[in-house]
Amino acid sequence: MTAYETLWDFAEDHYGIVTTSQAVAMGVDKHQLPAMAKRGTLIKKGYGVYLVKHHIPKENDVFAHSVALAGETAYLRGASVVALLKLAPTNPGIVYLGATSRVRRRLPANLRLVDMRPCNCVQYEGIRSQPIDEALRTALDEGAIEADRIADAAVKAHDEGWLTEAEMNKFIRAVS
């Protein structure tokens, strides 16, 4: 199997994204990635982050790509987790991220990053994320989503099995 085929197999399960550290872990020489980008088989998205050229875009690509651009300790947080799970309408132009370590990378203007925050991260749709109860609380505290939409999102999250009834009621009381 060629290096590109190895990267392709991995990237298709990860929203078309492969990082340098992931490629090295799969046995691909890190110097091959810039060469593949120069040939046009990979598209460089940011420092150490590449997109497989033949990737067919999916609905949640923007979230996965944003987390990858922010680094290995990054995660989706707040309103972006709510948007990922389609629990409430949010501003699609802004992606809210957190990171457990300091992030020094220069990120696109639409990414709102808060670093040095601990997180008990979970995977939603294969994307590292803040747990939904914490995400709803963060979105409410930051004013990223209106209070009535937070209550509706909590009910919907409960209906889909993401929240317990006690957690749902806590959010409904908090916004009342």
For each predicted feature, which ranges?
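Short gly/ser-rich loop at a beta-strand->alpha-helix junction or flexible surface loop bordering the NTP-binding
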Residues: T2-Y4, E12-S21, D29-S176
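The alpha-helix within a helix-turn-helix
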Residues: V24
